[in-house]
Amino acid sequence: MQPTEKYYEHDAYRREAVGHILAAEPDSRTGGGRIALDGTVFYPEGGGQPADRGTLTLADGTVLTVTDVHEQAGVIWHMVTSLPAGAVPGAEAAQAIDWAWRFDKMQQHTGEHILSGILHSMFGAENVGFHIGSDAVRMDTDIPISAEGLKAAETAANRIIWGNVPVNITYPTREELAALTYRSKKEIEGQVRIVTIPGADVCACCGTHTAFTGAVGQIKILAAENYKGGVRLSVVCGGRALEAVQAMRARQAEIGALLSAKASETANAVHRVYDEYTALKFTHFGLCSQLFDALAAQATPGADAIRIVPGLDPDGLHRLASRLSEATTGLCAALTPNEKGTGYCIAQAGGDVRALTKALNAALNGRGGGKPGICQGSCAAEPEQVEEFLREQDR
């Protein structure tokens, strides 16, 4: 089969074309199929960039939805949701890509080139992984880069955007290629397509890009984490960057409203609330210790000690049960009402409460476990029901 002409390689802004069907194959699993064309504006998945999506319209007006696109041995296959009788070799198919989808990928891919090139020139970092995800672009470097370094690179990358320099596509000869310094993640056979962004990057790439860097709009690094000796970046460009900044501003406004603080003062307000919370937590811990000591003092040595205390968190339950088991060798339990029913912690000095815990979970729809001397969990029953169950089991 003849290879498919790739219109998108020469004009990434071309949205429509009319091609002829080379082959059409049904897919019995999905009820759809795949169609190969002699020329296409649809970009196939590859090089970290998702495939285009859109429609194919046959001569009789039948519209086929293209959900995915793949390349095999130079032939580009368009996955469609249905394969009507008119989809036969030689038939015309009018192509239309989802332009909003494509332009987003052009912004992300061009932005990735700019930032990767800047990171390479500033720090010698190699891009060893790249994927345009639904929310952000993932970029992996082979060396660690500091937060200060990433900030400097982000600023430099955006300066390239502000310069609105052309994104040049060339197809050098083997001789020209041998004299050219460019980035490439793998050995490439056949004609090499070089994407050059003056002042930023020279890279072998088959993807779609904006004609000028200004169309990228903005590059924003959202997150960075250490990954396999390098750093993994979460990056957004263009419309995604605008949406990310708008979302950040909305969250900041919400926090500011809650804390009665201006946008420029939210960090200080959060620190203040955190300090207050830490102080209250320390006070709460001390008051709980006093309460647990008082409850333990009420326990009769050798007798059971089951206490219901509202408002305890898992740590508080564990502390109370442990404290009770220090005061008596009987069965001890700390219970507190929660959204599921009851949080519990069962303990017994020198005993094994695992079988009892298992029985409680089975009887009261609970979950939990632990060590012989202490078990913890929750169940779908009121604290009073749990207390009654424990007392009956211990008779």
Question: Where are these predicted regions, by residue range?
Answer:
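A glycine- and charged-residue-rich anion-binding loop/surface
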Residues: 1-395
